[in-house]
Amino acid sequence: MAQDPTRAGSEPPDWAGEVMQLSQSEITALATKAARGAGLSWGEAEEAGWACGWLARAGLPAPAMLLRGLDAESSASPLRAGIRLMDHAGLPEGPCALPVTLQDVAEPLVLVPFLARVAERMGAPVDLDLGSHTICLTGREPVPDLSALRGICHRTGARATISVSQSSRAAAPGRFDGRIERGVWQSLDALALLTTVPASEVSRQRAGAQSSDND
């Protein structure tokens, strides 16, 4: 039976080399479980999985970017920052009423899917200014091609400024990149395995007590 690369704790698949190709749904599932294993709530983990799939659609090395985002300290986490910005989008005190600057962000391109959702909810394009590059997100389909930005992945300690954009020019559509390196897959799979830890003796006893009460 073929190995399922999204199943937590699965044996490494039959790699033809150091890189394997996953589908968008496989990337999303693996990323969601890994994010949960890394300590995010299930709701946050689902958002992280969605963002990872979005980044892959934009032509970026999404699994590796997610892994670095999960490794970041909480204060530098692009996942937590992106989720906060997205949750507050559209409110009177929303994040883009005035420019917002985030300091010391790890893997800042992970913010991009969340800012696309911010733009969608606000009904206005949003700029992400990273100093050397400015990315305009309209929130409309298709997902833009960001493959030219692969060279600025791995950044740490970045300064990111988010503001309402003065431009609504749509970028060319992205081309899906489902490649994942063996080491990245193994690290994400190890995190995903943490979601399948057996129940503790205390939790089993509690479950038994609840069953007895219902007899």
Enumerate the predicted regions with their spans.
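A glycine-rich, acidic short-motif signal
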Residues: P63-D145
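Short, structured coil/loop segments at alpha-helix boundaries
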Residues: S41-W42, E107-L109, D177, E181
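Long alpha-helical, hydrophobic tracts
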Residues: M1-G82
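Extended, charged low-complexity segments
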Residues: A148-D215
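Proteins with a high burden of low-complexity, intrinsically disordered sequence enriched in S/T/G/P/A and R
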Residues: Q3-M20, E44-A45, L130, A148-T156, ...
